[in-house]
Amino acid sequence: MNDRPRRGTSVHQVLATLGYGDAIGNEVLGIQRVLRAAGYESDIFVETADPRLESLTRDFRELVGESHPDNILIHHFSIGSKASRVAYALPDRMMLVYHNITPPQYFVDIHKLLVRFCYHGRRELGAYVDRCDLALGDSEFNRLELEGLGFARTGVLPVVADFSHLDVTPNDMVARDFDDGWTNILFVGRIIPNKRIEHLIRFYTLYKTRFNPRSRLLIVGSSQEFDRYQAMLFDLVRRLGVSDVHFTGHVSNEELAAYYDVADVFLCASEHEGFCVPLVEAFYKRIPVLAWAKTAVPATMDGAGVLYEHADPGEVATLIDLVVSDSDLQERILRTQDAALERMAARDLAPTLLSLVDRVRAGPRLAPTAVARDFWQQFDTTERVAELRLVRPAIYRALPTATRASGITV
């Protein structure tokens, strides 16, 4: 590795929002610790931050005054972010970190605004192809998406899971309510369409009616901005006539730890994931995991747990019964999960991150990006025209030819 002197050398991070206790927020803070320990000046520039973390951040507009062609920006890409667009225009070298954008089709008829955001976000990501010195996925699945978009220089900065939020005293009220000899099937994650909560409900319904009436489904996670989807799930529960389905909403760390503690099996039917942190949280809490083998899930499972190939309620209900009723099988599954967790723990963020930084420092400089003052206005106009072509073709055909052919000036 190159020597790291680092006086006058800065590797800053820029992102839209720094959240408290979420996977990206933990990663950002971990990256900063590694960079500062290695001697780099490293600040976190954001548009907004959780009040508990505001003191650790700077306003993204201050980044302009800190900018220098020898600096490196670690840019955590997000949809339509002002901070991202400022970073694009600066002369600093750039390492883009891609945490995945859910395909917009999951939100059709559920969240129209998010359909638009995700559609434009995936297209906006393509504008960075020639701007990035290095584009990083936080999983191999995400790296392959970047490669498919045309990024020539890619790599993986793997998620290093932090379980400290689970090392708390569990909420005893949750334990009293649900640690009662019944079989608890747990899912943790946002109540959002790509998680396919409807599959979980159907799997559970068949398991409860065919194998085990003394069972319940615990769905732990926020439905914020997805009330319509949650209402559809409530209606599905009603139509199936199944009981003991519990939607908890957002929970505290103490409650989350308790839900993991009372769980007998962790069931995941997510169809689109860039990583899926709750899978490895369940490993950490030693709960057998059953998950649908889709997108990044098999790589995250890393040979552990149980993967199922088809979202067939009969097959999955039978799998649940096999795992719940066979203690020897449970122990074998847990050993595979323990081994996967050990492999994950052995991945040291510091050498991986610093070698990627060195790779950028040692690489040839990209041609400077000259950005017209109205570059992003032109980009947004072009995207609106492209959206019309896809969803309102009659209006698109009525546009003047010059508007239809509009492009971006740099």
Give residue ranges: language-model regions:
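Conserved donor-binding/catalytic core segment of Leloir-type glycosyltransferases
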Residues: 136, 176-195, 201-204, 218
